UniProtKB/Swiss-Prot annotation:
Coiled-coil annotated residue ranges, if any: none
Disordered: region residues: 116-151
The protein's name: BLOC-1-related complex subunit 8 homolog
The keyword Transferase belongs to this UniProt entry's keyword annotation: no
Species this protein is from: Caenorhabditis elegans
Function: May participate in the coupling of lysosomes to microtubule plus-end-directed kinesin motor.
């Protein structure tokens, strides 16, 4: 059986030894923690863990950048097209006015041709000659006849 008087001494001795051991362990841990080769090992470990995720994100970012560049090109092209169309409204208005004039002139020509056709059908014409030439020939003959009658 242990001696009751030696128990407090033993407890002090154990406490002092445990304190010394814990200080040495803490110092060893600090040294290991600050050792350069261990730090490099931890960096390599971190890099190996995080690099595949970074590479995947970079690939996704590159793909999204290409998609956004295409969308930006399409938007700029659309904006320039709409701006050009807005600037061309005066040209379109001018074309519409010219088309209206053409339709009006065509209607006038059709009306004149139908009027001439109906008037020529009603009046007598000399075959092979136009009405205007027949009228000129008639006038020439009538003036010759009137001058010969006067003489």
């Amino acid at each position: 059986m242990p001696d009751p008087s030696s128990t407090p001494n033993r407890t002090r001795e154990i406490e002092s030894r445990s304190r010394i051991i814990s200080e040495r362990i803490c110092e060893s841990v600090r040294l290991l923690d600050n050792e350069p080769s261990l730090a490099l090992y931890r960096l390599q470990e971190h890099t190996v863990r995080s690099l595949p995720g970074l590479v995947n994100r970079r690939i996704m970012l590159t793909q999204q950048s290409a998609t956004l560049s295409g969308a930006q090109f399409d938007l700029e092209n659309t904006l320039s097209t709409t701006t050009s169309m807005q600037n061309a409204t005066s040209a379109f208005d001018n074309c519409i006015e010219l088309l209206r004039n053409c339709m009006f002139y065509k209607q006038q020509l059709d009306f004149d041709s139908t009027r001439k056709a109906t008037s020529s059908a009603e009046s007598s014409t000399v075959k092979g000659r136009s009405k205007s030439l027949h009228n000129v020939a008639t006038r020439v003959h009538s003036t010759e006849a009137s001058t010969s009658n006067d003489a």
